[in-house]
Amino acid sequence: MTRHLTLCFILLIILIDKSEACFCDHYPWTHWSSCSKSCNSGTQSRQRQIVVNDYYRDNSCDQLCTKQETRQCNVETCPINCVLGDYGTWSDCDPCIRKQVKVRSVLRPSQFGGQPCTEPLVTFQPCVPSELCKIEETDCKNKFLCDSGRCIPSKLKCNGENDCGDNSDERNCGRTKPVCSRTYTPIPSVQLMGAGFHFLAGEPRGDVPDNSFTGGICKSVRSSRTSNPHRVPANLENVNFEVQTIEDDLKTDFYKDLATIGKNKNEDRSLSGEKKDSFYVPIFYSSKKSENFQRNSGFKNAIEASHKKDSSFVRIHKVIKVLNFTMKTTDLQLSDVFLKALIHLPLEYNFALYSRIFDDFGTHYFTSGSLGGKYDLLYQFSRQELQNSGLTEEETRNCVRYETKKRFLFFTKTYKEDRCTTNRLSEKYKGSFLQGSEKSISLVQGGRSQQAAALAWEKGSSGPEANVFSEWLESVKENPAVVDYELAPIIDLVRNIPCAVTKRNNLRKALQEYAAKFDPCQCAPCPNNGRPRLSGTECLCVCQSGTYGENCEKRSPDYKSNAVDGNWGCWSSWSACNAAYRRSRSRECNNPEPQRGGQRCEGKHWQEEDCTFSIMEKVGQPCISDDEEIKEVDLAEPEADSGCPQPPLPENAFVWNEKKLYSVGEEVEISCLTGFKAVGYQYFRCLPDRTWRQGDVECQRTECLKPVVQDVLTISPFQSVYKIGESIELTCPRGFVVAGPSRYTCKGDSWTPPIPNSLSCEKDILTKSKGLCQPGQKQSGSECVCMSPEEDCSSYSEDLCIFDEGSSQYFTSSACKFLAEKCLNSNQFHFVHAGSCQEGPQLEWGLERLKLAMKSTKRVPCGYDTCYDWEKCSAHTSNCVCLLPPQCPKDENQLHCVKMGSSMRGKTVNICTLGAVRCANRKVEILNPGRCLD
């Protein structure tokens, strides 16, 4: 019996195999077609070369064989070449530097492997000025004026020391007496403490304070490494030597990707050092305050390494200090080259000339810090191999720390981590966890370059020698760097030179414009939510965890997200200064916009700051120095025994021909600032007794200033001033509502109703009550029940205009009450429009729309509203959006005979077309329901 069953089974397999065993490779594939795109992910296809014969039919090849295949090709993002704008016209000839300049800007940085820009952005030429230079000579008063422009105490002249920096204080001197009774050696590497620091590039620049200046003082400090004391420069408040190597301060950090390193740290600090500055960027402190090293040149190497493989990173770092220093807070002597650069700046603002200060000397200087070195390595690991190792993030950090201490630092306090040698990754490399990394990237500071470079390694190499750390540590003593520093803006040092106030203001303006050139908002969006980073005129993509490739275009198998996070576009230009002496600018979250559930941009979408404007004729920049309280109208007062001084002006008023003294009989016209109008007699006359004949006049407000509200609130429309009768609407982010009225109207000189300073956003009562229920419902136990308009809607929610079908009346209701009433009486209440009910086109169309809706065959809930045949629901705004007439289907639902515009003939349209035409605000007359009669 068993034998017969086996035989039957074999015969069945043969029959099945014969009927369904088509060998598809019998029909070869064609070659792949050419790619549909040369970049940005195209497709290509191929087909089987089918021959329909008996074999094809008998073996069901038509059903079993795939006849066509497609695949992606050229997935690389299209390269974007760098584009420069044309040079502008030559500037006016500056009378102080006798040069003129023309500039051009980078219209588009290179990205995705595009051609870089190599041509200069600025060009200069000598010229002959037509005006005199207004910059005054340096007034040292009772001090000695050096040729460089530096002022030094007179007692320092002819003391045998180069206190001027250019030796001009030691010319024509007879015998000199030494200042100090003995010879001192300078503090090693003291010049490093006086270097400028370019925050945006992350590197030191030219000397700013002059730390060779001793000021005739013989203050000294001793080092345990040398027998002779060192003379302390006058700029230094405090110096103390130390060699500090603490074993327990070796730190490790784990990063899933480079995009998370230093993200948005210390954003409350401003680039210029002013709390209310308009351009905010994180100021980092080498290791005291933040571990942000994104601006280190090694970070670019890390970005390029991350493009080759989906990676995670472990950073291990340690600071070794040789000495600590603190600079004085006032009266710093500037270096000769920095001082000359400041003195030679033009009085008129010129970005090209002022921005060279930041190129040459950086944006900041060191106020305190340490000289020494920083052991700083960034290990790159394959993310897949780390996952397969079975180690947690904390265990990964501990293993890097443990092996570094054991192999390179030879610290005695090393606690063995068993899992560091027995995990899957270490076992592949003879128990070494570090050997399992792809490479280590050197972010080392200080020491000789040869020893610093030897600390890093790459996969496949033998790795650093065991004594490489001790050799580097020894070299740090002779070649230190500034570590653990604090910074201050170099603009603060622009003092005690001619026109210092004017030049400081120009430098602040230039710094804002200069910093904007480092903003990655100029870059195109990177694939897969990569973060763009602007390096010079090239944009790089910093890949998110799970992505890699030259432009982050490749995905790991476990990266499934299709969400696109939002990123900020560039700031707009500043608005004109308004009557409240404020100006503003804005930006949009559109580079790209959030899509498919992606995150919205973090931060402010608009900024405001104080500003000034001139009411006088523009006659060039005034030269304002530190010791002068000079304004634009401060002119030399003529000596005269007749005439009138400036007249007393009403509040918010000015006169166009303002001056110190007016002649007898001269008249002035009283004008009002923007947003005010003069009421009364506007003309004052100067009388012989040096008084003014004047009538009653005042400046009354005719416009409302844009209200100052909390950052979370958005004002629409956004203007500097609003005319009487104009209204604004305040809105909150999705899921929140204004905690009070949202609509305000300019009436007289104030807003109605008054806008409280405490006005903010609160969680939408509808969102809080909803849970898993529909709008207008709340969760009660495991059930959803209708909300009570009286009990559940006491908190504020936005106003809506509602139509009551029962009474045929429209009224203003809160959104909460509307949804609650609609839940209780589902067909009685209808949404008309957002905001309170006010007579006008919006209300008229809303009521007409409800009449048309009675004939609609489509009813789709959409936010507070219901969309009908001629509309679609916007998922982004939860509002009904009208279709264009050509977008309507060509069906015969609810036909009407209508007359459109000036046409005399009737036309048959369906309900969708009728609603779409009316929504477009075109005139339509309904002649009769159904088709038009011929």
UniProtKB/Swiss-Prot annotation:
> Where, in this chain's numbering, is Ca(2+) bound?
L156, N159, E161, D163, D169, E170
UniProt keyword terms in alphabetical order:
Calcium, Complement pathway, Cytolysis, Disulfide bond, EGF-like domain, Glycoprotein, Immunity, Innate immunity, Membrane, Membrane attack complex, Metal-binding, Repeat, Secreted, Signal, Sushi, Target cell membrane, Target membrane, Transmembrane, Transmembrane beta strand
Q: Which InterPro entries match?
A: C6_KAZAL, C8A_B_C6_EGF-like, FacI_MAC, Kazal_dom, LDL_receptor-like_sf, LDLR_class-A_CS, LDrepeatLR_classA_rpt, MAC_perforin
Residues covered by the TSP type-1 domain? 22-79, 81-134, 565-612
Q: Where is this region: C5B-binding domain?
A: 642-934
Q: Where is the MACPF domain?
A: 176-522
Listed under subunit, the entry gives: Component of the membrane attack complex (MAC), composed of complement C5b, C6, C7, C8A, C8B, C8G and multiple copies of the pore-forming subunit C9.
**What is the designated name of this protein?**
Complement component C6
Q: Where in the cell is it found?
A: Secreted; Target cell membrane
Ranges where the record places region Factor I module (FIM) 2: 858-934
- From which source organism is this entry? Rattus norvegicus (Rat)
A Pfam family this chain is assigned to: Sushi
Which BP terms in the Gene Ontology apply to this protein?
A: complement activation; complement activation, classical pathway; in utero embryonic development; innate immune response; killing of cells of another organism; positive regulation of apoptotic process
Q: Which cysteines are joined by disulfide bonds?
A: C22-C61, C24-C65, C35-C73, C39-C78, C82-C117, C93-C127, C96-C133, C140-C151, C146-C164, C158-C173, C180-C218, C399-C420, C499-C623, C521-C570, C523-C539, C526-C541, C543-C552, C577-C611, C589-C601, C644-C686, C672-C699, C704-C746, C732-C761, C773-C823, C784-C801, C786-C837, C793-C816, C862-C873, C867-C919, C880-C897, C882-C932, C888-C912
Mod. after translation: All cysteine residues are assumed to be cross-linked to one another. Individual modules containing an even number of conserved cysteine residues are supposed to have disulfide linkages only within the same module.
In residue numbers, the region (CCP 2) covers 689-765
The primary gene name is C6
Annotated LDL-receptor class A domain residues? 138-175
Q: How does it sit in the membrane?
A: Multi-pass membrane protein
Give all residue intervals belonging to the Kazal-like domain: 780-839, 876-934
